[in-house]
From Swiss-Prot:
Homodimer. Forms a heterodimer with the host cytosolic chorismate mutase CM2. Interacts with the host kiwellin KWL1 which acts as a defense protein that protects maize from infection. The keyword Glycoprotein applies. It comes from Mycosarcoma maydis (Corn smut fungus). The extensive loop region (ELR) is specific for fungal secreted chorismate mutases and is required for the interaction with the host defense kiwellin KWL1. Contrary to classical chorismate mutases, CMU1 is not subject to allosteric regulation by tryptophan and tyrosine. Activity is decreased in a non-competitive and allosteric manner by the binding of the host defense kiwellin KWL1 which probably blocks substrate access to the active site of CMU1. Residues 1-21 form the signal peptide. Disruption phenotype: Decreases significantly the amount of tumors produced during host maize infection. GO terms for biological process: aromatic amino acid family biosynthetic process; chorismate metabolic process; effector-mediated suppression of host salicylic acid-mediated innate immune signaling. The keyword Signal applies. Residues 117-140 are annotated as: KWL1-binding extensive loop region (ELR). The gene is CMU1. This is Secreted chorismate mutase. Glycans are attached at residues 159, 208. It is an enzyme of class 5 (isomerase).
Length: 290
């Protein structure tokens, strides 16, 4: 859903408001409109990452195996082609809250961030459950602790084959790491837009002196979480995965569970890590609450 507010709201303020109060209200409304427009654009950009991520996973899976020494070559390729976020995000990653999302070089940011276990071992992941809905977000005890381990586990599930072209395989592996990192790092500018858009809501949490830092973070995450929107994203990802992995006559099938792994990447890692980045960035803005 688009968040932009009609410009007629501003016209109404100027027509019926009075004096400085109307001017202040008009400025506040204008700031919310601008923040809503930014948020719309950033959400569109977030959605644009879905198809490239899915296609890259499918392309890598379609090669049919893993090359000898592929993991070592991926690290070497990352060293030669380091991922560089924008200057603003790079600066934030050097702060206390942003440092949690840095990765061991040469890995790109956020791919080693450890998400908490929030689901039970036997959680139903992709079917409606009475009283619990569908598509629960988060990690189970048996899931790898971070995205890098998850992608490594997916790679190791492929049979080793000397016929797989190493350069092609490594190129796709590196591209996937860059894509998932870039996708979750969009959480930072999204957080700035959400803070401006819901300034009073977040400042009510940030200025509450009875809450600890961890409690504030938990409340911010609760404020940010929109499970309906998460379900929409995961439903779309599931549909895209099925459509893009359609097999034609005499095609060799994708490795088992390829579609499940795509959904799990978004469900257990991409969505919750993006939310964690948003929450950490908003927590940094307490000094902007007046």
């Amino acid at each position: 859903m688009k968040l932009s507010v009609s410009i007629f709201v501003l016209l109404a303020v100027s027509a019926f408001g009075g004096g400085s109060a109307a001017a202040v209200s008009g400025k506040s409304e204008a700031a919310e409109i601008e923040a809503g427009d930014r948020l719309d654009a950033l959400r569109d950009q977030l959605q644009r990452y879905e198809t490239p991520i899915i296609q890259t996973i499918l392309a890598r899976s379609a090669l049919g195996g893993r090359a000898p020494s592929e993991q070592d070559e991926v690290r070497a390729a990352l060293s030669r082609n380091a991922f560089e976020p924008s200057e603003v995000i790079s600066e934030w990653l050097q702060t206390e809250s942003g440092a949690r999302f840095r990765s061991t070089r040469p890995l790109p940011p956020a791919v080693e961030f450890i998400t908490p276990v929030v689901l039970s071992r036997d959680t139903v992941l992709d079917k409606p459950v009475v009283g619990k809905g569908i598509f629960p977000i988060g990690r189970r005890p048996q899931d790898p602790t971070n995205m890098d381990e998850f992608l490594d586990t997916s790679l190791l599930s492929l049979n080793q084959s000397s016929t797989v072209d190493l350069a092609s395989a490594v190129s796709l592996d590196v591209s996937l790491l860059h894509l998932v990192s870039a996708r979750v790092l969009l959480g930072y500018p999204i957080a700035l837009a959400k803070f401006d858009w819901l300034h009073d809501n977040f400042c009510h949490i940030l200025t509450n002196t009875t809450l600890s830092k961890s409690q504030k973070l938990a409340n911010i995450i609760q404020q940010l979480t929109d499970h309906k929107q998460e379900v929409n994203v995961l439903s779309r990802v599931e549909q895209k995965s099925k459509s893009l992995s359609h097999l034609f006559r005499n095609d060799i099938p994708y490795p088992p569970h390829t579609q499940d792994r795509i959904l799990r990447l978004f469900q257990a890692y991409l969505i919750p890590i993006t939310t964690q980045i948003e929450a950490a960035a908003i927590l940094d803005h307490a000094n902007k609450c007046t």
